[in-house]
Amino acid sequence: MMSHQQVQMDLILMQGIWTSVLKMQNYSTLLQLGSSSSMPQRPRLLSRVSQRGRLTLNLESGRWRLSIIIFLETGTTQLVTTILPSTDYLGI
């Protein structure tokens, strides 16, 4: 579990989908991150950045990079997902 003064985060696998549980003051929200079949490794927290009323949690799982942006005043969340290109060479 990751904890910030206003936000706590836990990652769970729910019905084959990695899900972030965000607990903010008086309520909780679930944010689906991705399928465990395409993201087999549990996402791990790389960094958290707090600036001007928002908190950004940066996670990674294999080639997946995820940023969860939490607007602290409203509790609104935004998920930005990037999948890095494969480094496999097919040599065709």
From Swiss-Prot:
The keyword Ligase does not apply. The keyword Cytoplasm does not apply. Belongs to the orthobunyaviruses NS-S protein family. Transmembrane segments: none annotated. GO terms for biological process: symbiont-mediated suppression of host gene expression; viral process. Pfam families: Bunya_NS-S. This is Non-structural protein NS-S. Inhibits host transcriptional machinery, by producing modifications to the phosphorylation state of the C-terminal domain (CTD) of RNA polymerase II. Inhibits phosphorylation at serine 2 in the heptapeptide repeat (YSPTSPS) of the CTD of RNA polymerase II, suggesting that the elongation step of transcription and/or 3'-end processing is prevented. Inhibition of host transcription machinery leads to shut off of host cell protein synthesis and inhibition of the host innate immune response. NSs also seems to be involved in the nuclear relocalization of host PABP1. Keywords: Eukaryotic host gene expression shutoff by virus, Eukaryotic host transcription shutoff by virus, Host gene expression shutoff by virus, Host-virus interaction, Inhibition of eukaryotic host transcription initiation by virus.
